[in-house]
Amino acid sequence: DQLADYAQIFDEQTEYDQQQIDKIIEVFDQYRILTAIHHGNLGLKALNEQVEAALLEHLPDFQKQGDWYIGRPVMMTYNDYQLGLSNGDIGLCFKHRTQLNECEVYFPSLKKWIAAARLPKNIQTAFALTIHKSQGSEFDYVYIVIPKRDSHLLSMELLYTAITRAQKKVTI
């Protein structure tokens, strides 16, 4: 169970060095759930909530602090010049290095730490991404969630984009 393995990484660590952080990010970047839609039970929000709930079951000792918890991946959905973050930047939430009971987010593409409290409230959880937002990214394993009903958003081109995000395996 990939989710249990992911949770265990965070459960076992109390402090992180850069090598451990890089390993955690490598594990996180192996898998991604992609969807064409934002709303509904197969939409982005619902999929992220389902993964989040399952993950928190594997981290019984950790309490959510509002929307924040150790292991939460987040994606910026717009540019924030004050923070130096761009639309599409993805970070991972870790225990704060100096503040007890606080979280901070590491953005690996920028090699930058930002306290979770400084990030915008509408930052998006990123276990699942829209196919559109995944363009330019690659993952070892991709799970593509397709709506049961016809969706004007789903085209052969979009499906091709989703499939080509996978390096090793695609599950539809």
Question: Where are each of the predicted segments found?
Answer:
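Core RecA-like ATPase module of SF1/SF2 helicases and allied nucleic-acid translocases
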Residues: 3-172
